[in-house]
Amino acid sequence: MDNIQAKRYLLNKTETIESTPFGPDVSVFKVKHKMFATLSLGKGNEKGTNGKMAGHYCINLKCDPEEAVMLRDVFAAVIPGYHMNKTQWNTVILDGSIPQGEVERMIDNSYMLVVSKMPKQDQQSLLMPL
């Protein structure tokens, strides 16, 4: 999955909007004003990443803490969330090593984790089209 496919998939989630509150280099994706993903191009100088993000688009995704650790163990391109709570967020490096379906599943899970914390009325309106 490349950055264009990722962005398209993110924006296809019900009521998702994109904004750039951290500047033009970081796209933030929110549902009902709650962030569930960011997308940015790694520069290689990100502290604590050993240059893994260099030249690759990366998505920060919310994740169940136990699954977050498991995904990091399985995929070298999944690291603790850069600039995020490392217990509940992963950074997925879009370097082609993770199957597209798996990246989509991680995006879906992030979206659903955020939606599940919303009031029931909001949850119902968001999940109705699914």
Where on the chain are the PLM-derived regions?
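Charge-dense, helix-prone N-terminal extensions
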Residues: 1-130
